[in-house]
From Swiss-Prot:
One of its GO terms (biological process) is photosynthesis. HAMAP family: PSI_PsaJ. The keyword Transmembrane helix applies. It comes from Prochlorococcus marinus (strain MIT 9515). One of its GO terms (cellular component) is plasma membrane-derived thylakoid membrane. This is Photosystem I reaction center subunit IX. Its main location: membrane. The chain crosses the membrane at residues 9-29. InterPro entries: PSI_PsaJ, PSI_PsaJ_sf. Keywords: Membrane, Photosynthesis, Photosystem I, Thylakoid, Transmembrane, Transmembrane helix. It is a single-pass membrane protein.
Length: 44
């Protein structure tokens, strides 16, 4: 089962970038769900 992660396809740049962007978006979405007003501060 872990042999699929040793292939060149899973370590290529588009796959790593898609996983990284999805993980970052998920972290931001969950942070915004639990703390809805801390992400964007008003300028006033």
């Amino acid at each position: 089962m872990f042999k699929i992660f040793n292939t060149k396809f899973m370590r290529s740049a588009p796959i790593v970038a898609a996983i990284w962007i999805s993980l970052t978006a998920g972290i931001i979405i969950e942070f915004n769900r639990f703390f809805p007003d801390l992400l964007f501060h008003p300028m006033s």
